[in-house]
């Protein structure tokens, strides 16, 4: 009996020793979706519900509210943008949604109205003067809350509902929200006002017609007593200062005096209503519109413009021309052009666009007529007082979607001209536009093809909000994750809670809560594998080279 007891004691001691050799293993929950009663949650690795965040299931995104449950049938703000989730909790994309009190119980978005949510789920809304948005080829207007606008709309995006809303309005939208574009509008409400151009009361008008051009803006006179002239479907029409078509108009005010602020001599000059291409005064500026027999093109644009005569009294045509210390652009019949102007060389006018005719995406994608085969210049939009060529690297231009920075060489040509990405002073430009990171992300990725279209060789650079290229090795906070840079190149992105760390010539996932091994998550991205465009998250892609 005594011997047996001794053997049992040794067995107990041996078992205790073995237990000391086995390391303690911390148990973690499996991250993922969890059903709680009739509702869904998303549990993290600590088995806690994720709150106030988007999570993906297959191809759909879902939002978890402050309680950690799916939000349903609700419009809400997240990260400075508006989103809508349907009755199943899915984020709605590329769709119209009528938002009423049921979908907006707190009344954060004003009166009931239609809203549109794009491919990224973000609701379209006005940002500064950028309230005009295109959806499936049709233009619409939205206010700062994302509500679709209808009726008469001002240049600032305000709906006008006074007695004569057409006076200060620039746009018009029907009940379906579509802005009138290249389209006539018949106004049958009448008015007691008087036209400054014709001196006639609108009560004398049999009908009141308005026309809205390709940019959805109402045609109107900007030259005091002179009508605004346009060829529409082969016929020439005149419009007064309020945009009303002048039905009986032929030509108004044959000769008058005007003073040009800059540039000009101290002498007063004249503008003529019927210039026929003959000799003018020498080396002078003229404010006028051309006569019907000046140009062979029957679809020409007949509006008042500045013209310049040379030393022989001939109108300057189809060239960029120096006057004093400044340069100006003139089209094929001699009209001075302002805004964005395209020339093939310096002696072949191609096209002109108002600065607010396009948004940044059009310059990035090259979706502007003539921009691939012509040189882009910028001439001051202040037609009455300047109009000269603009050069420099920090020129702020008010585009349709807000202010953006452009740069032009001393010659006046845009950096990144003819739709070719250009690196200049540690920044990238395309068609003059500086490529800046999205404001909400802080950093973005620009891909550049240093090879050919048949044999591309891509380089991936990271830029900040001011377009500066990030050099060296960096871990950068971008949106809800981290953007990784090595040797001045983008090498990966991860949405970890903790910032990745550099170790053994690679970026590793880092988990500060894992005390046994902070680097258990392994390498974020194998840098021996070539980077490809599909590894750049859409929200971080600033420019994608062909």
Residue ranges and their predicted role:
Residues 2-546:
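Extracellular adhesion/carbohydrate-binding repeat motifs centered on closely spaced tryptophans
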């Amino acid at each position: 009996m005594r011997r047996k007891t001794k053997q049992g004691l040794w067995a107990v001691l041996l078992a205790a020793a073995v237990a000391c050799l086995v390391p303690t293993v911390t148990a973690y929950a499996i991250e993922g979706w969890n059903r709680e009663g009739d509702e869904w949650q998303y549990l993290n690795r600590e088995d806690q519900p994720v709150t106030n965040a988007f999570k993906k299931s297959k191809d759909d995104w879902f939002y978890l509210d402050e309680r950690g449950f799916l939000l349903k049938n609700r419009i809400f703000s997240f990260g400075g943008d508006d989103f809508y989730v349907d009755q199943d909790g899915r984020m709605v994309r590329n769709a119209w949604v009528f938002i009423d009190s049921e979908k907006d119980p707190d009344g954060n978005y004003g009166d009931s109205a239609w809203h549109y949510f794009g491919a990224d789920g973000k609701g379209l809304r006005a940002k500064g003067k950028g309230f005009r948005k295109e959806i499936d080829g049709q233009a619409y207007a939205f206010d700062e809350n994302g509500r679709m606008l209808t009726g008469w709309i001002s240049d600032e995006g305000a709906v006008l509902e006074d007695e004569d809303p057409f006076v200060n309005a620039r746009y018009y939208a029907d009940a379906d929200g579509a802005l009138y574009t290249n389209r006539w509008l018949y106004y049958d409400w009448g008015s007691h006002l008087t036209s400054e151009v014709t001196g006639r009361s609108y009560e004398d008008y049999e009908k009141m017609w308005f026309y809205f051009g390709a940019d959805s803006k109402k045609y109107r006179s900007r030259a005091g007593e002179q009508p605004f002239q346009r060829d529409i479907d082969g016929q020439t029409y005149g419009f007064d200062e309020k945009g009303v078509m002048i039905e009986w108009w032929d030509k108004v005010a044959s000769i008058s005096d005007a003073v040009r602020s800059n540039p000009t001599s101290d002498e007063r000059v004249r503008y003529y209503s019927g210039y026929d291409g003959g000799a003018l005064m020498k080396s002078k500026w003229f404010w006028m519109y051309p006569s019907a027999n000046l140009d062979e093109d029957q679809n020409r644009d007949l509006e008042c413009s500045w013209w310049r005569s040379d030393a022989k009294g001939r109108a300057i045509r189809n060239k960029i021309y120096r006057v004093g210390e400044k340069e100006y652009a003139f089209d094929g019949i001699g009209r001075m052009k302002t805004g964005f102007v395209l020339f093939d060389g310096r002696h072949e006018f191609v096209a002109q666009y108002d600065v607010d005719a396009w948004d940044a995406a059009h310059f990035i994608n090259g979706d502007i007529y003539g921009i691939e085969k012509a040189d882009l210049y910028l001439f001051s939009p202040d037609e009455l007082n300047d109009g000269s060529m603009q050069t420099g690297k920090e020129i702020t231009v008010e585009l349709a979607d807000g202010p953006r920075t452009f740069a032009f060489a001393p010659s006046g040509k845009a950096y990144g001209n003819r739709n070719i990405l250009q690196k200049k002073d540690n920044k990238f430009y395309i068609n003059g536009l500086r490529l800046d990171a999205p404001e909400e992300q802080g950093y973005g990725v620009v891909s550049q093809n240093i090879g050919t279209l048949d044999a591309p060789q891509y380089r991936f650079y990271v830029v900040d909000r001011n377009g500066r290229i990030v050099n060296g090795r960096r871990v950068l906070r971008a949106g809800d994750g981290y953007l990784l840079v090595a040797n001045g190149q983008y090498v990966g992105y991860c949405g970890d809670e903790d910032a990745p760390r550099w170790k053994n010539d690679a970026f590793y996932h880092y988990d500060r809560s894992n005390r046994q091994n902070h680097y258990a998550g392994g390498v974020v991205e194998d840098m021996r594998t070539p980077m490809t465009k599909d590894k750049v998250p859409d929200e971080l892609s600033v420019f994608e080279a062909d």
